[in-house]
Amino acid sequence: MKVAIALAKDGVGIYPGPFGHAPAYAVYEVEGGACRELERVENPYAHEEGGNKPEKLKNLLTGTALWVGRRFGHDDPHHSHHPAPPVPHRKTAAKTLEEALKELGCASTT
């Protein structure tokens, strides 16, 4: 399964804000306890608000079956974002990429 994980600017931490505002994503192939990094994707939409941003992210992160981040959408019920992303998502309490990969069941990473 191809997974996109929201990264902080340092590339090691998990972005603490909404998934769509992350500066970049680590894309991994997760299979049978092994996780292989495929690429890092810069987010050109990080500063955009509302509109069709979820669809733009879906196109940016083509082929991902799961998005992992600290938050999805905004807590404000009047915010213009869609209530849920167009790809299945998983909230994480992980603070680092390594912790998030462990939550996904990764026994080994490459």
Language model features with spans:
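Non-catalytic interface/targeting segments
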Residues: 1-52, 63, 88-110
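Mid-chain, well-packed structural core segment of small domains
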Residues: 57-88
